[in-house]
Amino acid sequence: RMVSVTFGGWDHHSNIKGAFDGQAPQFDQAFARLITDLQDRGMLKRTLVMVSSEFGRTPKINGTNGRDHWPRVFSVAMAGGGMKEGYIHGASDALGGEPDRDPVGPEDLAKTMYRVLGINAEKRIMSDGGRPVDIVNGGRVMTDWLA
């Protein structure tokens, strides 16, 4: 089974501080409660919880007190489902603008997620047009992340 939850409204090109002051506590409480609830019910070890976005944010505040889209660095949080507890991988430079240590690409994230979910990431599927398509194009399983 898979559940996808969307908590939108994070596209803060302006007034990022005011927006975060309202949104971040709501998100923190919901995320912490979900992890705690899954743990209390004995479900966390077999449930992968992931928080991500499709891109990061510019390292510097823009002219309207916000941040714009930035593809070079962003964070992902993963819990349960065979992931190490408290593990932090990689680092950005001092400005948060470029990878500084141990960069990971989307294909690495996908391949790792598929591994813990028991999905063969090497499998090819056929497109509607009859063309074979790799589930993941390249990438590596991030074994350091696994419990």
For each feature predicted by the language model, list its residue ranges.
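Ligand-binding pockets and gating/stacking loops
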Residues: 1-147
